[in-house]
């Protein structure tokens, strides 16, 4: 759709023509403010606007008033809730999982003209300015501005960084952002639901990060995002597998929009003076999270939506996969060679080829190619390998479970008579020619139990240790679901799906872990997630890191990616891999929380003899670093930190780092600078202080750039601080089964440190 000259209407998906039978309602100054059960309730009148491009009140339409509930929680959280529907504010739902520290703070009012909202601990958390704006009147050329709710919030009590509602306009009739508003359908049947909006003021130099696995540059200011999960189809476009309705601002606050609806977020884009949020449902539920550091804010977000669970030790080892292995013999040959040639590895993953028919997911092994699945899994276990299996949440036409699923309504049901239109996989990375009859309905408890105990448990009982919960970004949108509309379910479906798989895996296999692609708020509780179908190229490598950094700034601790990218180019399935990309992606993978080789053609390193020795050395380094990785992971599960950390987490006042998306901290000690080009060169920025190259021992001073450094193919720039202590494992192993972490040693980066030999 072409952009109009009225950006507010563009943002609100609004057409002022009468034919649409929709109206914008703008919030006015509060008509009433009161204390109620520890909350502050602000009655906000809304005035309907005329159907014209120059906004003006429709004085013939009576105002409608709705309550804005302001609630505070320890620590440093303010909640804003208003609904034009019949929704009720709740502290318990699928997205929310409050930590014990999150306790309500009673609020009370002080003052009248300038009304302060003060917490029981004495902190001023908001101001409602009811004073009359000052004027020096000399002209009647333009109408006077409409009344405005002037409300400013201070979630951590710091009045120097107030978050104010934004009434942003060029002239009184020409609005760019509304502080609060909604769109009504005027009682006319429409395909579009009612929509509600809220806006906050932002500064000219303000930066924004987060919003999910965003394959974009680090600073997201000047961009608008449609928060609707969809198959990303790679990592170099606007689509997104994992949208998270949360952002973090360089002014040191975060905003979490508690919704599963389709929504839009404009970060100083439609208006450069405003952050604007649009929810395609007539309810707004916003948590403003304060803090002194990004880690404080991210921890506050996790305190609302849940902390990640700790994955098992073996999951931090190397995973080997391909799309796909087709037989037990093929898999066992690969596992034998990994052991024979001393490539350390913990997990073998079977993708789409373990079924009776490739891609026809029936949760059962092909009896011809896997004649003894129990013996197959046992033999791999004896060799130190865990088994991971691919599946997806749709029941295909022809699947043996279809009739049972339809009869018992375990899958979504067509909303109209006739053959259902499959919108769950259309235009996506599902490369099968199958038709899907329905989406497993996780809003229905009986369907969830059927999935957990009828489909997954028999596999887990055999000894399978991980389920790849692929897809889940899309559902059948033309179907009916037990306890939700498809519009409200689509985004949160990933959470319900992954929770079910995670819970039964932990219950039966003993280890809580999945391998998931989609995501929404709360999914970080059920690790782990990987970055989807990246291109095996320099662009795919760079895009993957960007996505991982933003996901870590959206509450996720654990994240992986396909090494060395998922698909080939230009021939998706058949073009050979670039060996330099293979090495550089391997080096990057060693310094991420989890490391899986996967893709459309052969990924085993011996197929690339020119680089196999380099790859093996980096694999061995990965296992030597596991004590450090486990230590940092345990800390991440209790804090706000991810494993892959944007530099801004540690240096929020350094303006440079809000623009750096090709370097990162791995845990709290390593500064990692992947090489992402065939020239084997890169620029490096080192934050202030002294730094030591972990591989060579070279000392460098920070607070500056180092330009055009040459990096040999077998090296990657990795830096640590002087006096850092790095836990390492002193022995080579074949898998984590061979490790006794009590034998770990501590490497101190002192004056005698000359680097770690690969």
Descriptions of predicted regions:
Residues 12-69:
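N-terminal-proximal low-complexity accessory segments that begin disordered
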